[in-house]
Each structure stands twice: as structure tokens, then as C-alpha cells.
């Protein structure tokens, strides 16, 4: 057997849920006085899958805490069968878990669980995102008056955006605080959660619907500051003050970068 063929067989064996090796692989290995080749392979197989389960539990502690060991491991093993590790780093092992849940469970069960998984993954993405230089209040104070109307901004790389239709934040907080998990409940109104990294600390904040629409307008749809004020015209003379208040909050949070008008 060529080395490449042997390596492929070992990989297929480790990725399989069945701990019994095929005869060709087993016969290629030597037993010792204390351990047979089949026993050695089984130990390696179990250790590998245990490490994958450990990684998924670490990435999704709230999902794990909500389901418990047995149900989480059953879900995780089904996920690993459908999505074997394809990356050299365990960092990306759980990237598709939320989408998998949507197709694996019936919709009534999948919706709150996949939303919680997306929330946890958003925290992971925020922490690992590339650095960005946030626009500061000091820089804004120095901005010439004529530049305010054309001001455009974008989100920093670490900022993640999630619309929650269930009490996923309450479940996540219960896990963080090691408290009792509340029952999963649909929200009366959807909740927009923004997650970002502040130096080495991951932070989050829930936004009211009007603030979420304003932030999305400026950072996704490309509104200028003048256009934001225009969207708030129903507030009358209070529109500029509301726009400035939101902008100050976003800058204090450290969410934004300025888009240079000179860039193409």
C-alpha cells in the first residue's frame, strides 16, 4: 500500500463514526504485547472524535448548556458526519452548525436553537476579526462643518449584526452567568443585537428598531449624515439632534470607520 493510500485510509477511518477499521488498514499496523492494532486504532479514533466534540462544546457553550451533554453530543456527531473538519484549524469546525440545525430539526425546534448558535458564532467572529481603527469623538469634533453633510461611515471588521426573534440573549446570558436557563420564548418584537470587539473584550448591545434602521442605513445602504437626517424628517427640528445622538453613541461604542470621500 502506498503511503498516500494509507494516509487516506487513516483519514477515512477517523472521520467515520464506526470505530472498526477495515481489514487492509488493520493489517498494515503491528500489534504490541500490551495492545492490539485494532485496540490502538480504536483509542485514536475515540480520542480524535472526543477532541472534535470538545471543540464544538467550547464554541457553543450556551447551545451545549441548553441541550445537555447527551442531546448536544448527538447533534454534534450528526453535524460532524455531515460536515467533517476541512480546515487545519479547529477554529472553523463549527462554522456551519447553525445552518445544519435548520435542516436537521423540524422548524419549530430549529428556529430558536439555530438562532442561539448564530449568536454564539457571532461572538467568536467578533473576537477573531482583523483589527480596525475606529473613528473617534475627537476626530469628529475636528471635522469641518462643511464635511458633516457628506460624512459616510462603515462598520469595523469586528462588528457582527444579528436579528433575534427569540430570547437568545437571555439564554446566552444565563450560560455566561452560570444560572438557570429560561425557557425559549419568541419575542413580541424582533431584537437587533450588535456585537463587536473592544481591544480584547467582546461587547454587545441591543438596538431599538429605529436606531437599528439608522445604523444599517449608514453602514449598509451608504447614507450620508445628511441623508440620515432626511430619513428622520418626521421628527422635525429634533432630527439633527437624534442623528447626532446616535452617531455619538456609535462612536463611543467604537463601531465605525469613516469612508474617505477621495477613495474610489
What spans do the regions from the language model cover?
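C-terminal structured interaction module
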Residues: 200-264
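Hydrophobic packing positions characteristic
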Residues: 81-209
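Short, functionally important structural connectors and interaction interfaces within domains
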Residues: 33, 59, 145-147, 199, ...
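Alpha-helical interaction segments
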Residues: 34, 38, 113, 151, ...
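N-terminal, charged low-complexity regulatory/assembly segments
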Residues: 1-132
